Amino acid sequence: MARVRQATRIPVTAGQCEITSHGVRRLVDAGAVDFVNYDVSEGGGVTDWRRAAEICRAAGVRMAHHEESQISRELLAGVPHGTYVECFADPDRDPVWQAMWANRPRVRNGCMEVSREPGFGIQLDWKMVERYRIA
């Protein structure tokens, strides 16, 4: 992937399939990426995501995130090299994302508000949860 990055001026993003900050370090050390979109829910949680973010910051690589905008908006806002939140705000593309929040953040002009609530600021819509409950 480093050769692809060297052959183009198009920024390269990768990391959504990594499950640890060690995998992120390999991408960064190889010079393979301009952005890392390490997924906190697929990887080692918030602590490991922050570890990966520090690896990237030290190397001048920007952070993004793969999906889970309800979590990534807070993480990316908390690091100086955080960039974009991946969000499927179109109800036809992701109707569950539209319905799962009691306090869904506004997406306006391509930007999502960061919560002022404690933690991730997530308040689930329990009617929606009940509708999809299996047991």
Model-derived regions, located:
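Catalytic core of soluble alpha/beta enzymes
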Residues: 1-66, 102
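Flexible C-terminal active-site loop/helix
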Residues: 68-135
